[in-house]
Amino acid sequence: VLGCSKTPQTELNQAKQQAAEQVSKTAKSGLEQLQEKQARTKVEEGRAYTGKAEVALYIHTFHKLPGNFITKREAERLGWKHKGTLNEVAPGKSIGGDRYGNYEGLLPQKSGRSWKECDIDYKTGNRNAKRLVYSNDGLIYYTDDHYKSFEKLY
């Protein structure tokens, strides 16, 4: 059309470009927020932690879980049932240190790599869907939807 500086196709392409830039900015700001929180987070060896940032940093720094985590087998020995509340048999403890199979292949695979998992933000009652999954070679991922999606932390 003469006299028009923009065609509908040009406007569509510009809208797509703007949307892509916004997604990129949002992803970047999310990553920047995570990095800023990691920089502010401090952990001490031997202390108990249950939050995402603190437990991830503890694993990253000390290459082990904080001492307030026990495996499912250890919890069962104390009388815990998988659908029951851990706090009744092990006050102050969280489940962690058990093998994670990565059967769906959502996490990066590499020869010799193995994964373990731990609960995040457990206080009392039944376990929630939040987990950290960490590898024997330093990778740490977070899921808040019981392994359907992951966010890389380290």
Region spans (language model):
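Active-site-proximal polar cores
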Residues: 65-66, 79
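Functional cores of ribonucleases/endoribonucleases
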Residues: 73-154
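N-terminal low-complexity, Pro/Thr/Ser-rich intrinsically disordered segments
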Residues: 14-64
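Bacterial signal peptide processing site
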Residues: 4-8
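Short charge-dense sequence patches
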Residues: 24, 67, 103-104
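Winged-helix/helix-turn-helix nucleic-acid-interaction surface
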Residues: 11
